[in-house]
C-alpha cells in the first residue's frame, strides 16, 4: 500500500479466533476504518488454532479482495508470539464454547488453557500501551486470567465486553418507548457478561427525560432486565447459532470509544478492573459506566445507588468473585 504524505502510521490490531463467526464479521469493519477512524491505517495480525489456518487463509483472500485503502498489511499465525508482536490493540475473540453438560468450572479451566498463554505472550511481545478487549466467554474472568499473566502491563489495559449487553439494553428501551436509539443516553450494564448482569436505567434518559418516568417499574424489573440478560440465548434459539455480527459490532464500539473517546456528557459500559468504586471488590473485571478521553477510560463517579441497584450489583459481583476463586484454585491466577 502506498502511504500518502501526511497520513498516519499504521497501527497493529491483533485478533484471535480470526476465522470464527465473530472474526468474520469483525475484520472487514476494522479494515474499513469503523473501529479506529477513516484516516488510520491498520495492520491486521490474526491468530488461529492450527486446524483453522486454512479457513483463515480464505478470509485473508477476501480481505485482500476488498482492496481496503486503510489495510496496510495482514499477518496470520498459530503462534501468539507472532500475532501479538508490537500489537497496539488486541481483541481476544477465540474461546472454548460451552458444551452440553459442562459445568462452569470446566469451562473456566478450558479457557484458562487459552487465556493464560495469551496473557503471557502479550506480556512478552505486545506494545507496552496495548489495549486489550476480551470478547470470548466467560469474558470477564478470561480477561482476569490474561491480565494476571501479564504482570509487566498496566492491569487497566485489560477490559472485557459488556457493550453487546449495553447495545441490547438501548435497543429494547428504544422499542418500548417508540424512540430512535439515538435518543437514549447513559444506560449502564453493571457486572458480569452473564445472566446476573444488571442493566440499570436509573440514570438513563430518553430525549432528555428520565427513562424510568416513561416505563412502568413492573415492566422494567420483570421483563426488561431478564430480556436483556437472556438475549444471547434467544438468538441461539432463533438462529441456531450464537450472536456474531452484533457481538462484532459491539467490540468495534467498545474499542472505538476507548481509542477515540465518548461523546461529551455521555457514558458507555465497559468491564474494567474495579478500583473499589461503588463498593465493588478491587481487581474484579466488572461492568461499570465509563467515560473515555485521550485513549483512557475512567469510571463515572458519584451516581446514586438505590437499594434495588445495590442488591443487583452485589449479586453479579458475587458471581465474579466465585469465578475468581475457581480460577485461583485451578492455578490460573494468583
Curated annotation (Swiss-Prot):
| UniProt protein name | Malate dehydrogenase
Citing just one GO molecular function, the answer is: L-malate dehydrogenase (NAD+) activity
Binding positions for NAD(+)? Answer: 17-23, 111, 118, 135-137
**What does the sequence similarity comment in the record state about its family?**
Belongs to the LDH/MDH superfamily. MDH type 2 family.
Positions binding substrate in this chain are 98, 104, 137, 168
Task: Check the UniProt entry and state the signal peptide residues, or none.
Answer: none
Q: Does the keyword Oxidoreductase apply?
A: yes
> Which species does this protein come from?
Deinococcus geothermalis (strain DSM 11300 / CIP 105573 / AG-3a)
Q: Which reaction does it catalyse?
A: (S)-malate + NAD(+) = oxaloacetate + NADH + H(+)
User: Which InterPro entries does the entry mention?
Assistant: L-lactate/malate_DH (IPR001557), Lactate/malate_DH_C (IPR022383), Lactate/malate_DH_N (IPR001236), Lactate_DH/Glyco_Ohase_4_C (IPR015955), Malate_DH_type2 (IPR010945), NAD(P)-bd_dom_sf (IPR036291)
UniProtKB keywords: NAD, Oxidoreductase, Tricarboxylic acid cycle
Stored PANTHER family: MALATE DEHYDROGENASE
Q: Which of the seven top EC classes does this enzyme belong to?
A: oxidoreductase
Q: Which domain of life is it from?
A: Bacteria
Q: Which residues form the active site?
A: 193 (proton acceptor)
Gene3D superfamilies reported in the protein's UniProt record: Lactate dehydrogenase/glycoside hydrolase, family 4, C-terminal, NAD(P)-binding Rossmann-like Domain
Q: Which Pfam families match?
A: Ldh_1_C, Ldh_1_N
Q: Name one GO biological process term.
A: tricarboxylic acid cycle
| Record flagged with keyword NAD | yes
What is the documented function of this protein? Catalyzes the reversible oxidation of malate to oxaloacetate.
Q: Which EC number(s) are documented for this chain?
A: 1.1.1.37
Amino acid at each position: 500500500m502506498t502511504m500518502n504524505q501526511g497520513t498516519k502510521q499504521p497501527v497493529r490490531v491483533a485478533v484471535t479466533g480470526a476465522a470464527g463467526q465473530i472474526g468474520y464479521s469483525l475484520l472487514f469493519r476494522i479494515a474499513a476504518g469503523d473501529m479506529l477512524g477513516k484516516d488510520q491505517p491498520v495492520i491486521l495480525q490474526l491468530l488461529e488454532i492450527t486446524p483453522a489456518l486454512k479457513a483463515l487463509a480464505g478470509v485473508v483472500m477476501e480481505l485482500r479482495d476488498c482492496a481496503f485503502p486503510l489495510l496496510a498489511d495482514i499477518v496470520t499465525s498459530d503462534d501468539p508470539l507472532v500475532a501479538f508482536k508490537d500489537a497496539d490493540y488486541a481483541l481476544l475473540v477465540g474461546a472454548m464454547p460451552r458444551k452440553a453438560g459442562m459445568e462452569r468450572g470446566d469451562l473456566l479451566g478450558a479457557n484458562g488453557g487459552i487465556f493464560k498463554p495469551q496473557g503471557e505472550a502479550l506480556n512478552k511481545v505486545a506494545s507496552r500501551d496495548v489495549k486489550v478487549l476480551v470478547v470470548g466467554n466467560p469474558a470477564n474472568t478470561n480477561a482476569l486470567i490474561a491480565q494476571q499473566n501479564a504482570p509487566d502491563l498496566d492491569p487497566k489495559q485489560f477490559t472485557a465486553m459488556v457493550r453487546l449487553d449495553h447495545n441490547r439494553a438501548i435497543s429494547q428501551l428504544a422499542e418500548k418507548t417508540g424512540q430512535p436509539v439515538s435518543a437514549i443516553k447513559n444506560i449502564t450494564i453493571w457486572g458480569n457478561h452473564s445472566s446476573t448482569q444488571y442493566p440499570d436505567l436509573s440514570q438513563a434518559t430518553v430525549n432528555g427525560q428520565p427513562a424510568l418516568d416513561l416505563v412502568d417499574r413492573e415492566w422494567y424489573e420483570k421483563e426488561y432486565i431478564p430480556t436483556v440478560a437472556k438475549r444471547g440465548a434467544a438468538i441461539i434459539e432463533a438462529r441456531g447459532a450464537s450472536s456474531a455480527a452484533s457481538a462484532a459490532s459491539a467490540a468495534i464500539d467498545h474499542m472505538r470509544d476507548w481509542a477515540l473517546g465518548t461523546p461529551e456528557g455521555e457514558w458507555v459500559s465497559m468491564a474494567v478492573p474495579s478500583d473499589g468504586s461503588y463498593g465493588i471488590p478491587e481487581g474484579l473485571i466488572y461492568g461499570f459506566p465509563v467515560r473515555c478521553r485521550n485513549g483512557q477510560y475512567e469510571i463515572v463517579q458519584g451516581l446514586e445507588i438505590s437499594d434495588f441497584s445495590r442488591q443487583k450489583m452485589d449479586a453479579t459481583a458475587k458471581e465474579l468473585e466465585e469465578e475468581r476463586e475457581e480460577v485461583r484454585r485451578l492455578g490460573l491466577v494468583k
